[in-house]
Amino acid sequence: MEFALPFDHTFWVIPGKFLAGPYPGSHDPDEASRRLEALIQCGICLVIDLTREGEIRQADPPFLPYAETLNRLAGKTGVEVSTVRISIRDQESPSPGGMNAILDEIDRSIATDRPVYVHCWGGRGRTGTVVACYLVRQGWSGDQGLKRLEKLRQGASNGHLLSPKTEAQRQFVRSWRNWDRRNI
């Protein structure tokens, strides 16, 4: 079964269950609505926001918050969509406890048949770090997780760009198995 990508720069980690990519809103309300409706059509029930409070206002023009619009659009279809913010500073990795919290949230959502969308600003650095650590949690080595992430992102229009973006983020992935509470 083929699973559509809702908008540019998104990619399925687990088709129909775990989607990743960039900030789903926009500075244009109509574009934001189109993107959010596309997430709903993909069955997304949980959105995990890795951006920091206020980060979207730093764009020029500033991006609009999306949670209210997402809930309104989901309500029209009778679908319940939750959002949770677990912030990571741009270009950085979270603490091991922070990454465990993010991965536990993803695991719970998938286990309860609630497809999840994980995003940061551009969908490469923080999002790539989370996806690669998720793959390590599933049994891949850090380097294997990074290679698999590269393959998963090939369908994204920015898939040719490095993800995670920084060497520190990539090193975090390589070390993740030592910090994952599932392995301790």
Residue ranges and their predicted role:
Residues 127:
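Ser/Thr-glycine-rich phosphate-binding loops at phosphate-binding pockets of nucleotides
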Residues 1-117, 122, 130-184:
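Cys-dependent protein tyrosine phosphatase-like superfamily
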